[in-house]
Amino acid sequence: MADIRNYTMNFGPQHPAAHGVLRLVMELDGEVIRRADPHIGLLHRATEKLAENKTYIQSVPYMDRLDYVSMMVNEHAYVMAIEKLLQIDVPIRAQYIRVMFDEITRILNHLLWLGAHALDVGAMTVFLYTFREREDLMDCYEAVSGARLHAAYYRPGGVYRDLPDSMPQYRSSAIHDEKTTTARNENRQGSLLDFIEDFTHRFPGYVDDYETLLTDNRIWKQRLVDIGVVSPDRAKALGFSGPMLRGSGVAWDLRKKQPYEVYDQVDFDIPVGVNGDCYDRYLVRIEEMRQSNYIIKQCIDWMRKNPGPVITSNFKVAPPPRLSMKQNMEEMIHHFKLFTEGMHVPRGEVYAAVEHPKGEFGIYIISDGANMPYRLKIRAPGFAHLAAMDEMARGHMIADLVAIIGTQDIVFGEIDR
């Protein structure tokens, strides 16, 4: 009798379900996966090395391009690390703005994850719905920073500027007549806070729509239940964090366990799974969107009652106001020095981590007292999750691999760095 031999197959890096440039070398027994070996590095851009040759402020835009779905949260970890080295305090209003935009970014990330995950598994409608909601949140990014994607809005010592008092308006065109344009501008007549508040009232209904389509859907459950099961102990041993860890039943969230900014001032719950499978991780992320919406509402209420500065008044760290800079020679010098030479950060080393939509995103900086980092290390949550791909996929069918890749919420910008 002839020996039964496994055969090897490549999955990606051009596969539509590979979520970027993932290449998996799979060993198959028929259609059953015996081994899945991830090959990474196809999106490596040497971000850590580039940061060693840029001033601290010049590296902020690089952070947006790591996980390019969760832009402002990447910036948050980076500026927090710099602030720890400088030992400066961030104005309380800036902290609330950061928390609010962290949660807007979390919803942005989870909406893209849900749409892409559902599309991979075969449910196309959800993808169209989630991108409708993402459009409103992208407009919030654009209102504060001028960019829909790579915002560079967080700065050491605070944020670039306060929230605007008006929203950009749609204009009528050959495609959209005046009546349609008026309807689209209906919720854009007030400030950015008014626009976000209107979104928070509408959003729970949208999440209900997603759940109506998916949560009790027989085919959705057949594709996700008991797929990619990871026990709590294995999840901790593998270095999981974020929804991947909470989906396995471990209630670990940096916003609660190691609170930063004003997370200890807002109320929210940590959703956790029971079985540690793809379906539990789906439920955890769905509930996280509801909790993020609740946090945003609390931030809006606080900011309406408490105006104030949004960046430190230390001109060695943050530029002086534009008007005074053009009227005062000393402030002009501060501005010139900051944007040419950059600020000199005290000697030392520091690690700052935030609860990223994908897990614990950390920045480790070693400073030698110069105006550039001596060494910058990025702790990407997706790296540990992708390393567990072999263990999660073993014994499953090829079709189940697509669900496992989706549940890991892989973005190669942060994994390859």
Curated annotation (Swiss-Prot):
Q: Which Gene3D superfamilies match?
A: Cytochrome-c3 Hydrogenase, chain B
Q: How does it assemble?
A: NDH-1 is composed of 14 different subunits. Subunits NuoB, C, D, E, F, and G constitute the peripheral sector of the complex.
Q: Which family does it belong to?
A: Belongs to the complex I 49 kDa subunit family.
**One Pfam family linked to the record:** Complex1_49kDa
Q: Which GO terms describe its molecular function?
A: NAD binding; NADH:ubiquinone reductase (non-electrogenic) activity; quinone binding
**Catalytic activity reported:** a quinone + NADH + 5 H(+)(in) = a quinol + NAD(+) + 4 H(+)(out)
State the membrane topology.
Answer: Peripheral membrane protein
Name by which UniProt lists this protein: NADH-quinone oxidoreductase subunit D
Described function: NDH-1 shuttles electrons from NADH, via FMN and iron-sulfur (Fe-S) centers, to quinones in the respiratory chain. The immediate electron acceptor for the enzyme in this species is believed to be ubiquinone. Couples the redox reaction to proton translocation (for every two electrons transferred, four hydrogen ions are translocated across the cytoplasmic membrane), and thus conserves the redox energy in a proton gradient.
